[in-house]
């Protein structure tokens, strides 16, 4: 997992934009690369790139390997928007995820999305209801022996929620 304090430089962002958006159709490689480095982008840029990514993947977006990459990018965008308390962008990512309908075969992503929805509720709606969803998601990860994932989200929310006036 990445250090959330690291940000890409303007020069790096320009290079990445030129690379990503001169390619007409994104495949698995571009999605994997974008998914890996996109956490370095500030939210406005992540949002812009994600919208453009959805257009670039229209043709190949339904392939199983590409679908997982796209879903991961959208869920990461949702977390990023919630962290910055940008409800409009969080709602956009939620809409795109709901529209794509996470399949049962991607249970891990469904659990992470449930955690993200709990975070959304904690920040924008009903705090206790959201915290319950987060804890339930982490418990499911623990029960399924996704130890690293459960630990990551426990630490993530210990940091995020202790630094906020909820």
Task: Outline where the language-model segments fall.
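"A position-specific structural signal for the A-helix of alpha-solenoid helical repeats
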Residues: 1-2, 32-36, 72-80, 109-120, ...
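Alpha-helical linker/edge segments of TPR/alpha-solenoid repeat scaffolds
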Residues: 5-6, 42-48, 79-81, 117-129, ...
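Helix-turn-helix repeat elements of alpha-solenoid scaffolds
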Residues: 5-14, 43-55, 84-95, 130-133
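Hydrophobic, aromatic-enriched interface-forming segments
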Residues: 13-61
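Amphipathic alpha-helical segments of tetratricopeptide repeats
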Residues: 15-21, 54-61, 94-102, 135-146
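Alpha-solenoid helical repeat architecture
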Residues: 26-33, 64-73, 103-113, 144-155
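Extended alpha-helical scaffolding segments
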Residues: 76-132, 141
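C-terminal non-catalytic interaction modules
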Residues: 128-166
């Amino acid at each position: 997992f990445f250090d959330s304090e690291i940000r890409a430089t303007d020069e790096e962002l320009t290079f990445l934009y030129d690379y990503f958006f001169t390619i007409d159709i994104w495949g698995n490689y571009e999605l994997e690369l974008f998914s890996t480095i996109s956490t370095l982008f500030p939210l406005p840029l992540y949002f812009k790139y994600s919208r453009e990514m959805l257009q670039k993947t229209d043709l190949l977006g339904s392939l199983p390997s590409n679908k997982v990459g796209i879903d991961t990018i959208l869920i990461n965008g949702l977390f990023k928007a919630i962290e910055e308390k940008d409800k409009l962008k969080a709602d956009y990512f939620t809409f795109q995820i709901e529209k794509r309908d996470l399949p049962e075969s991607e249970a891990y992503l469904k659990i992470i999305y449930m955690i993200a929805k709990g975070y959304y509720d904690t920040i924008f709606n009903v705090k206790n209801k959201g915290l319950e969803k987060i804890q339930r998601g982490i418990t499911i990860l623990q029960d399924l022996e996704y130890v690293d994932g459960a630990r990551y989200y426990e630490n993530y929310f210990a940091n995020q929620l202790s630094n906020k006036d909820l």
